[in-house]
């Protein structure tokens, strides 16, 4: 029983010894290996510093582009455009393009500080695509923008819409020509009426000016055809 008690008591003493070692600070000249309560290893310290640096870089990285839209959509091409915040200083942009439900990714990098659009080519007709845009600065890349989903039209649909546009343009041209012809006809008729009215007024003025002369001539002729005068100045008397 004593042996059992003694054996059971030894581990307790050893445990208390370890606790005392943890409480004591190592001596100046001690060459003992670090105990259970030693300082963290260098790997953990490096990991912590790396996390801090990564957080600082993320804080200085630009914001994600905004107002990402797809325009000039065709069967085999499209144009993606975006905007950035006014205070952001960027040196380029990265565009990620992929098909919907497909992991294949196309990466396009634009090293231009003024561009706000990028052309997408070699697209497949009647296919859905997803586009992301990232801003690039000296500190790194920004988070990806909101995904934009678009679908390319079919070539037949594009041709049909193009034909409709052409027909509409032709109809507009014809209507414009008809309107121009109608306006010309109206102008010509108005000029003709103006000429007729001017000619009538002129003839009326001429006729009105000639009326007094005609009246004088009629009066003179009437006086001449009245009773003739005698040569001596008296009137001739009829003989009974």
Swiss-Prot record:
Protein name: Fibronectin type III domain-containing protein 5
Organism annotation: Rattus norvegicus (Rat)
GO biological process, alphabetically ordered: positive regulation of brown fat cell differentiation; response to muscle activity
Keyword Metal-binding: no
SUPFAM superfamilies given in the database record: Fibronectin type III
Post-translational modification: N-Glycosylated. The extracellular domain is cleaved and released from the cell membrane.
Annotated PROSITE patterns: FN3
Motif placement: Microbody targeting signal: 238-240
Pfam hit, one: fn3
Keywords assigned by UniProt, alphabetized: Cell membrane, Glycoprotein, Hormone, Membrane, Peroxisome, Secreted, Transmembrane, Transmembrane helix
SS bonds (residue pairs): none
CDD domains reported for this sequence: FN3
Residues the record marks as carrying a glycan: 67, 112
Bias (Basic and acidic residues) ranges: 11-24, 210-221
């Amino acid at each position: 029983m004593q042996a059992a008690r003694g054996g059971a008591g030894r581990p307790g003493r050893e445990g208390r010894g370890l606790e005392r070692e943890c409480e004591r600070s190592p001596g100046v000249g001690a060459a003992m290996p670090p105990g259970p309560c030693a300082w963290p290893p260098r790997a953990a310290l490096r990991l912590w510093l790396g996390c801090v640096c990564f957080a600082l870089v993320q804080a200085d990285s630009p914001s994600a582009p905004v107002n990402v839209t797809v325009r000039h959509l065709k069967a085999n091409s499209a144009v993606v455009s975006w905007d950035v915040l006014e205070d952001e200083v960027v040196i380029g942009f990265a565009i990620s393009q992929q098909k919907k439900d497909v992991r294949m990714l196309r990466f396009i990098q634009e090293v231009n500080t003024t561009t706000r659009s990028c052309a997408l080519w070699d697209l497949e007709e009647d296919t859905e695509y997803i586009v992301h845009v990232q801003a690039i600065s000296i500190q790194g890349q920004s988070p990806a923008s909101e995904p934009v989903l678009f679908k390319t039209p079919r070539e037949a649909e594009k041709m049909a819409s193009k034909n409709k546009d052409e027909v509409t343009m032709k109809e507009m041209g014809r209507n414009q020509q008809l309107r121009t012809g109608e306006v010309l006809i109206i102008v010509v008729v108005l000029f003709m009426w103006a000429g007729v009215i001017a000619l009538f007024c002129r003839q009326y003025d001429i006729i009105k000016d000639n009326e007094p002369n005609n009246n004088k001539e009629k009066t003179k002729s009437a006086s001449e055809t009245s009773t003739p005068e005698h040569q001596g100045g008296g009137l001739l008397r009829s003989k009974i």
